[in-house]
Structures are given as structure tokens and as C-alpha cells.
A protein has these predicted regions:
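Pyridoxal 5′-phosphate
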Residues: 1-257
Length: 257
């Protein structure tokens, strides 16, 4: 672990920059690794290409460490939005979501409903726009199968209590857009079933560093819809046949990052 002094010195952006909730300027470590990878990929050597490809597993392990899970349950995604859509397009039944959430959540719910007709958006109306355990409890119905929520509200900074929401919704699916707080706030991610986020804000890792974690319950209940060549259990590139979809989190991926 680096010292607090070394960590402080890694912030090289202009003095006064405070907009990490929108974009975190890339850290020196990220820039150095990116440059090194570009040089390795520029040589054409197989060893350099394979070295860069191994970073996929490392990234999954690091995300898993922050969530408190295993890397096998973590998928890398192009963005938070794609991770959320992988989850919501796989839901069947009424999914509770506030129309006041960041547009990613209500948009994904509505698009999934329009395209597949198996998810029904259950719009959660609140007086202050905050998704509290009390508001969710009052709105729950026997038809509710999932709740989609932001970890941190992007307008107010309200922090959602995932543990309390889990107590309220029981064994229903809890799908969390964590991008606004991942890496900066403590949260009980194990209370959730899907956690989607990105490294371009508080982790200072740049865009394209998205991920989605799936619990065992999520893997049992979600239907992989947007599943590509990496969504199978076949090692390497399948040829001359179409393999079945994986039963692991890989099912919710399309291609290698």
C-alpha cells in the first residue's frame, strides 16, 4: 500500500479541480500503464500482445477486491450503461425504478420493456426524488421482481443504503448503478445482485473501464440477451458450431475488452 503522501502527489490535475463526480483526470499510474501497453502492442511480438491481454484478468480481480467477491463473478464492460442494460434486458417481471434516477436506469428499463415485452417498469414516485427504504417498502407489490437504483444520486449526493434496501425487498433482485460512488464511498455491495460501474470517475482510470458484477441469484434469474463470443464456455474462438450460452457471468459479455 502506498503512503498518503505518495497518493496525494499522484493528483496532478490543475489546482482547484473538484469535478471528480463527472470525470476523474487520469492518474500517473494509469497513464504510464497505458503508454507501456501501447508500446508493447506496437512491437508485434506475441509476448507483448499476451502481456496486455492478461490485464483483463487483473482488472477483474481488482474490481472483485473492491466489491468483496471473486473475479469469476466480474465482467468487464465498455461502460456502466452497457452493464446496466445487460442486467435489465435480462429481467422478467415488474422492475421498480424511479423516473428521477440518472437517465441510464429508467431508459434501460423502458428500452427493455419495449424490445422484449417481459419487463414491466414500475415507476417509483417519491416526494424528494430519493429512493429510500421507506419509499420502496410502500411501493412494493407481489409482482415486483427487481429494484434498480443508483448508489449515489448524481444531483443531490444522496447515498443509497443497500443493506436496508435488501431487508425491504427480500429476495428480489437489486440492481445498482454504482458509478457515482464506486471507489470513494463504502457500501455493502454484497447486498446487491448486480453492481455496474466505471473507472473514469473516482478511480481515475479513464473511459472504457466499465464493469458489471453478478451475484449467484442474478445468474440464476437473469436471461442473457446480448451475449457474444465471450459469453460461452468454449476456450478460444468457436468454429463450425454455435455453442450454448455460459451459465457464468461471462454470459453477459459480447467480446473481449
Amino acid at each position: 500500500m502506498i503512503s498518503i503522501e505518495a497518493y496525494r502527489e499522484s493528483f496532478e490535475e490543475e489546482p482547484g479541480y473538484l469535478d471528480f463526480a463527472a470525470f476523474g483526470p487520469l492518474s500517473p499510474a494509469v497513464r504510464e500503464e497505458a503508454h507501456a501497453d501501447l508500446e508493447a502492442l506496437g512491437t508485434g511480438r506475441r509476448s507483448g500482445i499476451e502481456h496486455v491481454e492478461q490485464h483483463v484478468n487483473l482488472a477483474r480481480e481488482l474490481v472483485a477486491e473492491l466489491i468483496g467477491s471473486t473475479a469469476e463473478q466480474v465482467t468487464l464492460q465498455p461502460s456502466t450503461t452497457q452493464g446496466i442494460m445487460q442486467a435489465l434486458f435480462g429481467v422478467t417481471g415488474a422492475t421498480m425504478v424511479s423516473p428521477n434516477e440518472v437517465i441510464t436506469l429508467p431508459l434501460a428499463a423502458q428500452r427493455a420493456a419495449d424490445a422484449l415485452h417481459v419487463l414491466t417498469p414500475q415507476w417509483l414516485e417519491t416526494t424528494d426524488g430519493m429512493v429510500t427504504p421507506e419509499a420502496v417498502r410502500d411501493a412494493l407489490t407481489p409482482d415486483t421482481t427487481a429494484l434498480a437504483v443508483s448508489l449515489v444520486d448524481y444531483r443531490t449526493g444522496y447515498r443509497t443504503d443497500l443493506s436496508a434496501l435488501r431487508e425491504v425487498i427480500g429476495d428480489r433482485l437489486l440492481i445498482v448503478d454504482a458509478v457515482q460512488g464506486f471507489g470513494i464511498v463504502e457500501a455493502d455491495y454484497q447486498a446487491a445482485d448486480v453492481v455496474a460501474g466505471n473507472g473514469y470517475k473516482w478511480l481515475r482510470a479513464g473511459r472504457g473501464a466499465g464493469f458489471a458484477w453478478f451475484s449467484e441469484r442474478a445468474l440464476e434469474r437473469l436471461t442473457p440477451v446480448f451475449s457474444g463470443v465471450t459469453g460461452t464456455d468454449v476456450m478460444g474462438l468457436p468454429t463450425d458450431f454455435v455453442p450454448p450460452v455460459s451459465r457464468s457471468a461471462h454470459a453477459f459479455t459480447v467480446a473481449r475488452p
